[in-house]
Swiss-Prot record:
Protein name: Translation initiation factor eIF2 assembly protein
Inducing factors: Expressed during exponential growth and repressed in stationary phase (at protein level). Levels not affected by the presence of mating pheromone (at protein level).
GO molecular function: ATP binding; magnesium ion binding; protein folding chaperone
Quaternary data: Interacts with the eIF2 complex gamma subunit GCD11 (via C-terminus); the interaction is direct and appears to be specific for an unassembled form of GCD11. Interacts with the eIF2 complex alpha subunit SUI2; the interaction is direct. Interacts with the eIF2 beta complex subunit SUI3. Interacts with DMA1. Interacts with DMA2.
Pfam families registered for this protein in UniProt: D123 (PF07065)
Cellular compartment(s): Cytoplasm
Chief localization: cytoplasm
Purpose of the protein: ATP-dependent protein-folding chaperone for the eIF2 complex. Binds to the gamma subunit of the eIF2 complex which allows the subunit to assemble with the alpha and beta subunits.
Organism this protein belongs to: Saccharomyces cerevisiae (strain YJM789)
Record-level GO BP terms: eukaryotic translation initiation factor 2 complex assembly
Keywords: ATP-binding, Chaperone, Cytoplasm, Magnesium, Metal-binding, Nucleotide-binding
Keyword rRNA-binding set for record: no
Length: 360
């Protein structure tokens, strides 16, 4: 019988406190010089949480505020669903929906004020950003220019639902979220080159590995790896470790051109729930601490074109929201959202056509 090697599963315990330390409002206050300008709305009202958790997406229609997402649909032969409506009306049960203008008007106004102050923003809750729901906006990013885009993005995200319902899943000291306060973070929008985002694994105050976050091939990254590692070493040992209460964590950073500064994007728990990207968690957990405090970790990069990666867009498994999969959305809401989506795409196409004509 031939010998066969087996890989031992290495347990990586994580506590509730470690997860809480990775909440944006906690760690961002420790490193204000290394994060983008943002507004944090703390202790969100229960009605807002219910609004995010309810079936369907109810957008506010304000009299003095125009939004393309709430403009009345003009019926024509392409969107006349009268044959559907009679049957559906009899089968639909009345459910009291949470509405922004009625149930949390103060928060709604704070969101509008934040947009006026910061311009476009990218939202996130305590831990997660709705990166899986960018399909719902015409620009296919998390860039929100108006309050209805915030509502659409947050409502359509499974990552946001994870924060609301399973924030402490897998914690050794319990997963109960009772009494947990939620925050909404609005970060001023900036265009980031995904090739220059990196994930850094820190175990027992030592860097044990780093990887690019975007899993596509960029031919210029390898020759810059020493520059990237110098900046990563500096921010981990001189900035983060002296103030962060835990010695094991996963740090997301951004290093923009001309590669003389580094910014903190996020801090995540050192746990299997955090995506290990180009590493495996067993691989990370098995890395021994450096000898003589001299760290010689690997910055792992994609070294060749991965055509399969291009064929499978990131977060594509989430590009149909759970509400639609379960057919639990209000049918009328689905029809209206579909029509508005068509109108937005048509408007975007006209604007692009106008821009191209003006350039010629």
């Amino acid at each position: 019988m031939s010998s066969q090697e087996y890989t031992t599963f290495i347990d990586i315990p994580v506590t509730r406190a470690q997860v809480e330390h990775c909440s944006y409002s906690f760690w961002s206050s420790l490193y204000p010089k290394y994060v983008p300008k943002s507004i944090v709305l703390k202790s969100l009202p229960k009605k807002f949480i219910q609004y995010l958790e309810q079936d369907g997406i109810k957008l506010p229609q304000e009299e003095n505020s125009r939004s393309v997402y709430t403009e009345e649909i003009i019926r024509n032969e392409d969107n006349d669903y009268s044959d559907w409506e009679d049957d559906e009306d009899t089968a639909t049960e009345f459910v009291q929906e949470v509405e922004p203008l009625i149930d949390f008007p103060e928060l709604h106004q704070k969101l509008k004020d934040a947009l006026n102050e910061l311009g476009a923003v990218a939202p996130k809750l305590n831990w997660s950003a709705p990166r899986d729901a960018t399909w719902i906006l015409p620009n296919n990013t998390m860039k929100c220019n108006e309050v209805n885009e915030l509502y659409l993005l947050l409502n359509a995200s499974n990552y946001i639902m994870h924060d609301l319902q399973r924030a402490f899943k897998g914690c050794v000291d319990g997963d109960d979220i009772k009494g947990l306060k939620f925050d909404l973070v609005l970060r001023q929008w900036c265009d980031m080159n995904p090739a220059l985002e990196f994930r850094v694994f820190v175990k027992n105050a030592h860097i044990v590995g780093a990887t690019q976050r975007d899993l596509n091939y960029y031919d210029y990254l390898d020759e810059l790896s020493d520059t990237f590692k110098d900046l990563i070493d500096e921010i981990v040992h001189d900035v983060v470790l002296p103030k962060f209460p835990d010695k094991s964590f996963v740090l997301d950073v951004y290093i923009p051109r001309p590669f003389n500064k580094i910014f903190i994007v996020d801090i995540n728990p050192f746990a299997r729930k955090t995506d290990s990207l180009l590493f495996s968690w067993n691989e990370i957990a098995a890395i021994a601490p450096p000898k003589n405090d001299v760290e010689d970790y690997e910055l792992r990069l994609v070294t060749r074109h991965n055509t399969g990666r291009f064929a499978s867009k990131e977060h594509s498994e989430n590009h149909v929201p759970q509400d639609l999969v379960e057919a639990s959305l209000n049918p009328e809401a689905i029809r209206e959202l579909t029509q508005k989506w068509k109108e937005l795409l048509s408007q975007q196409a006209k604007e692009e056509s106008s821009d191209s004509e003006s350039e010629t």
